[in-house]
């Protein structure tokens, strides 16, 4: 029967081929060509004619089929209506597909049909293979409007909305009146989206198919009609339980006899246990416990994880930044000034340990020279810095902040710069205020001493202490005599100390000062030439007991030359080494000088009335940096690099030794009450010592960014102190000392004064308070002195 069907099918196809109209090469289908409106009308006529031909050919084929069936087969075997229906359905499906397709013709043939045969002998049409070229993919199909990513809002004021592929304008579609637009916004049409079509400029609406797809997605319905959710299940296993076995073969004898093969395998395991190749779990645990205490000290076994709770992993290195790129942005590259500053900075103080560089490509980047050193330092950090686990403390942060009064309630204190004293060439290293508070004396690298009137800022006195053409010494320290009736100014420059009496103080003060200095010349001539040591600076009369041994002459008191005498220099003290600091006793007859390079004669005490100089120490441990007298006790404070010693001059004994904990002290100052001391250091610290409390600092203040050069208490009744640093700033503090020994001093930061420029890593070099007012004078490396007032 199947053979007959195939025969009839082949005959029907041959008949159709004979009756089908011939198609010329010029009318073959080509969907790639573009046609105009007239060609489209012709193509529609051709489609209609082709539909009629298809219908006629189908009718003729049905009649011929019925005749063939009647000749070869019976009606009971094959139903001719089935064949006719199938053919009719096929024809209808083809016509339905062709009715909605616009067929375009071209002059050249692009699709040639090749006829062949199936395996059963039927003919087949061999179509050309589709070449997967770029033109066959329309995923990146260009839009009709070629404006790209430009928004349509850019064309709102223009009559067109863009341009097509040929550069012609795409005109904007006509819009309705304002009433129509209002009605459309109220009554939304079906398929309304509120979007604009970029190709046409009109509102974008959804089709019925898209609306139906959205409805199915909202209702969780099946979006593909070809999928049947109710397909019949395939029962791979039957649900019926079989009672009888599929086979009733009796069990063989080998099922009930021990297996020889298993016996061999068991004996093999037994021999392994006897030989020790297989260890039972109990013995294995015992061996592991024994091996736990036996390990190789030099074994590099890093595979075993050590996940103990107290083991802390090494911190990870921070990720590289843009500065470390081989092609960093321009703003990360250093300028010539920044590069020079980076090279002059100490390696420990540099922000980065490399200079950002830019290369054209990665292959041009050379080897990193500091890689080995950085790895070594990383290893040292991990080896020498043990990691410690700290438990977090549940402490209220507000309780850690001291309850300090407001700075507004602690006025007066300096807040602004009122006067700038400018006249020195180079750095201004030191300055001092006379006891009356009217005159300011400054000394600098130019070797001159200048006296300024404080109220007007006018220079009233000038003295060339050092001749820069012959000597390179600088004026390192100067200080007025605390006795306002004499007007003596002591100046330390190089290895000499000059005693000046400025000619601006009036005849009486100038005469009293010169007379006090000249009295010493007579004692030096007719007095004790052996210059016995006398450390009792508070005594009214000399103690000439023979217990003190005669000391060698450590200084020379010289008379000035005529030119120096005309400038106001009354006496010159020649020392062995350069003098860096000097300080007067409160009575004005003694002053102490410090020469750090002079060894055991680093500290010298000079007596003005007798022209005597003596060294109170036979040996000196360490480098002496500063020395001060106690405000009212016969005590001398001597500061070395790391310690501060307090000597009793009347008993000539060491009374106390303070350990500030700093690496290199720069200066000290004593509170007017005498029971507190301030020390400054080059490692950015300010240390407050309570002399009645302990040898260690009561407070250590770290607020400066660079070395602290000097620190001073206010000598009047104001509880103020200030510190000067190389960062160019001056910090003013309020420090109240109470009579009650059980109450700690009150330290409150008040103001940070900035105005001096940092020159060659040097900022503010010295400072001094006004004896009566809350005024502060500072000397900077920028060649100026400044007055800070309230």
Curated annotation (Swiss-Prot):
Residues 1-93 are annotated as: Disordered. Component of the NOP7 complex, which is required for maturation of the 25S and 5.8S ribosomal RNAs and formation of the 60S ribosome. Belongs to the WD repeat BOP1/ERB1 family. Residues 255-371 are annotated as: Required for interaction with NOP7. It comes from the Eukaryota. GO terms for molecular function: large ribosomal subunit rRNA binding; ribonucleoprotein complex binding. Residues 20-89 have a biased composition (Acidic residues). Residues 371-407 are annotated as: Required for interaction with YTM1. WD repeats lie at residues 423-462, 470-510, 574-616, 619-657, 660-699, 703-743, 759-790. GO terms for cellular component: nucleoplasm; PeBoW complex; preribosome, large subunit precursor. Component of the NOP7 complex, composed of ERB1, NOP7 and YTM1. The complex is held together by ERB1, which interacts with NOP7 via its N-terminal domain and with YTM1 via a high-affinity interaction between the seven-bladed beta-propeller domains of the 2 proteins. The NOP7 complex associates with the 66S pre-ribosome. Its main location: nucleus. One of its GO terms (biological process) is maturation of 5.8S rRNA from tricistronic rRNA transcript (SSU-rRNA, 5.8S rRNA, LSU-rRNA). It holds the Pfam family BOP1NT. SMART domains: BOP1NT (SM01035), WD40 (SM00320). InterPro entries: BOP1/Erb1, BOP1_N_dom, WD40/YVTN_repeat-like_dom_sf, WD40_repeat_CS, WD40_repeat_dom_sf, WD40_rpt. SUPFAM superfamilies: WD40 repeat-like. It comes from Meyerozyma guilliermondii (strain ATCC 6260 / CBS 566 / DSM 6381 / JCM 1539 / NBRC 10279 / NRRL Y-324). It is found in: Nucleus, Nucleolus; Nucleus, Nucleoplasm. This is Ribosome biogenesis protein ERB1. Keywords: Nucleus, Repeat, Ribosome biogenesis, rRNA processing, WD repeat.
